[in-house]
Design a protein with these regions (language model features):
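Short coil/turn segments at the loop-to-beta-strand junctions that recur within blades
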Residues: 80-85, 130-135, 170-176, 210-215, ...
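Short coil/turn segments that connect the beta-strands within blades of beta-propeller domains
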Residues: 53-54, 92-93, 142-143, 184-185, ...
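Conserved beta-strand position repeated across blades of beta-propeller domains
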Residues: 47-50, 88, 139, 178-180, ...
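C-terminal motif of bacterial Sec signal peptides marking the signal peptidase cleavage site
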Residues: 18-21
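Residue position within the beta-strands of beta-propeller blades
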Residues: 58, 97-98, 147, 189, ...
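Asp-box/BNR beta-propeller loop motif
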Residues: 63-78, 110-128, 156-169, 196-207, ...
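Short, solvent-exposed loop/turn segments at conserved positions within beta-propeller repeat blades
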Residues: 104-111, 148-151, 189-190, 228-229
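Beta-strand-rich domains and repeat architectures in extracellular enzymes and scaffolds
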Residues: 38-65, 82-87
Length: 288
């Protein structure tokens, strides 16, 4: 396995503690079949989450998993074991991702660049940056896509669903990125030096008045959320200028996202929890 895949939550916890102390082509990359049976024990290292229709999609070190509405049992989606390091739902049935190929695909480069699925995760094809980019942080809103390339630390921005890119220097090492649902050029990043905001898609940055660090989620309602490495949830009603605690997930997070008004958090024990009340209370949404 890629060692960097498993240390990210630990690095996040370490960063939170440190801050507290301070005050292209169309190549087919995978063609899974329809969803298969119950989880086979291979669900590990959740890197990303998304909701399409009424189904929760779970992007992991061993491929894509799903949990339909009303079912907490996560099931493998198809046969691909590609390592999906970055994952985001562009719109219903259309996903973007990044990471590393299925070990059986020896003809693929180690970094898949940006890949997309237009059939709800059943098949994937290369969009751009094949062999060059490995997005460990990947977010989208409409046709706007932002990624943090782990190969060089750059923040990359696309306004055409990943066909072309602009490259920007981050203000510091980035853990997480969130897009303002009301303005696609306004983005926030959580870094090893705190939270920074950009009004122009990553070209320029200014620090916010906080030393918090963690995973960001920005629901459509306008309230911004930050999930710390200790599982504590913070909420901001003013775009990240001020924060207040709202609750806790009861574990160490590995992924965090918003869908509608709901929040979803993946934990290091490979469960996924959901909150419908702004992070105050959490219920189990999916488990191996």
């Amino acid at each position: 396995m890629h060692r960097r895949d498993v240390v990210r939550p630990v690095a996040l916890v370490a960063a939170v503690m440190a801050l507290a102390g301070c005050g292209g082509g169309a190549d087919q990359t995978a063609t899974p079949q329809a969803p298969s049976g119950p989880a086979d024990g291979g669900l590990e290292h959740i890197h990303g989450l998304g909701v399409s229709g009424e189904t929760l999609f779970i992007a992991t070190h061993t491929g894509l998993w799903t949990a339909p509405r009303g079912d907490v049992q996560a099931r493998r989606f198809g046969s691909s074991r590609q390592d999906i390091m970055g994952f985001s739902v562009l719109r219903e049935g259309r996903f973007v991702g990044s990471g590393h190929p299925d070990p059986s695909q020896t003809d693929q480069p180690p970094n898949l660049g940006l890949i997309e699925s237009r059939d709800g995760g059943r098949s994937w094809r290369s969009v751009s940056l094949r062999g060059d980019a490995d997005f460990h942080v990947l977010q989208s809103a409409g046709n706007s896509v932002y990624g943090v390339n782990s190969a060089n630390g750059q923040i990359m921005a696309s306004s055409d669903a990943g066909r072309s890119w602009q490259r920007h220097k981050p203000p510091a090492g980035v853990f997480s990125l969130a897009i303002d649902p009301r303005a696609g050029k306004r983005i926030l990043v959580s870094t090893e030096r705190g939270v920074f905001a950009s009004q122009n898609g990553g070209e320029q940055w200014r620090p916010l008045r906080t030393r918090l660090a963690g995973l960001l989620a920005w629901p459509a309602g306008g309230r911004l959320y930050l999930l710390g490495g200790d599982g504590a949830v913070q909420m901001s009603a003013d775009g990240g200028q001020t924060w207040k605690p709202t609750g806790a997930i009861g574990g160490e997070p590995t992924a965090f996202m918003a869908h509608g008004a709901d929040l979803y958090a993946a934990l290091s024990d490979n469960t996924v929890k959901r909150s419908a009340d702004g992070g105050r209370t959490w219920t189990l949404r999916a488990a191996p």
